[in-house]
Design a protein with these regions (language model features):
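N-terminal Rossmann-like NAD(P) cofactor-binding subdomain of oxidoreductases
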Residues: 1-179
Length: 179
């Protein structure tokens, strides 16, 4: 999808991360990333050469996918319950998961962090690891696009004690980042 494409674009030539595996639904599994995405590539930059020939794995084959990676960026199109379950399955393979999905945003032991604002929220990971029975695996989520944009500004304004803040968003109707 669009978020996966954005991940691929942002991770191209990244100094810390290398995309070694892509996973999607059974419908795309077995195809190359280029075949699976095809004309649906919507980024302004071309599809990175490094991912074009990667064979898409089935996201539901958790053990197999997790054995090929050290870290998972998650942006899947499933029900919230399915997302929660599969992200925790990945975490239980001792694979850290950073999720773009909203499913875990209200899970008490899953941190939702804007690092410059609330890095202390990472502390809840230890409680999550106990619940999941993991030593390395966990799930962390990012806030929605509006909150992550406003949080730094609102935090800076706190010292001025505003009594009213009006925020307007112009989000994509689809919620898929299409503007």
């Amino acid at each position: 999808g669009m978020v996966g494409q954005r991940f691929i674009s942002l991770l191209e030539n990244h100094p810390w991360f290398e995309v070694v595996t892509v996973a999607a639904s059974a419908r795309s599994a077995g195809k190359t990333y280029e075949e699976a995405v095809g004309a649906r590539w919507k980024m302004t930059t071309p599809m990175p050469e490094a991912v074009k020939k990667l064979v898409v794995m089935n996201v539901s084959d958790v053990e197999k996918v997790a054995s090929t990676v050290d870290f998972v960026f998650s942006a899947v199109d499933m029900s919230k319950e399915e997302i929660k379950a599969i992200e925790e399955e990945y975490a239980k393979t001792e694979t850290p998961v950073v999720s773009n999905n909203s499913a875990h945003r209200w899970t008490p032991d899953v941190p939702m962090v804007v690092p410059e604002i609330n890095p202390q929220h990472f502390d809840v990971i230890e409680f999550q690891k106990k619940r999941l029975g993991t030593t390395r695996g966990f799930v962390a989520v990012k806030p929605n696009c509006s909150i992550q944009s406003y949080a730094p500004v609102l935090t800076a304004w706190k010292e001025f004690e505003p009594y009213e803040v009006v925020a307007t968003t112009y989000q994509a109707i689809s919620g898929a980042g299409k503007t």
